[in-house]
Amino acid sequence: MTLNEAIKDKVYEIVEIANCDEALKKRFLSFGIHEGVQCILLHYSMKKATLSVKINRIQVALRSHEAQYLVIKESV
């Protein structure tokens, strides 16, 4: 499941950053996004074009095409 498929206000864990280029991986790292991090989908725009995600007490905005590279699982 990718971050695009997440449900608002549920806690997820990022299990993989799949098939993206190095520039995007560096951008994710600059936001604190990496494998093992917990995240919560806070808001999204119409048609989920942009997503607002909480990661380590920081709110981050991601585009839909960026979120598709983040593989997540529901956190316990």
Swiss-Prot record:
Annotated GO biological process: iron ion transport
Domain of life: Bacteria
InterPro entries per record: Fe-transptr_FeoA-like, FeoA_core_dom, Transcriptional_repressor_C
GO molecular function annotation: transition metal ion binding
Keywords tagged on the record: Ion transport, Iron, Iron transport, Transport
Alphabetical list of SMART domains matching this protein: FeoA
Family to which the UniProt record says this protein belongs: Belongs to the FeoA family.
Biological function: Might be involved in Fe(2+) ion uptake.
Protein name: Putative Fe(2+) transport protein A
Lineage, top ranks: Bacteria, Pseudomonadati, Campylobacterota, Epsilonproteobacteria, Campylobacterales
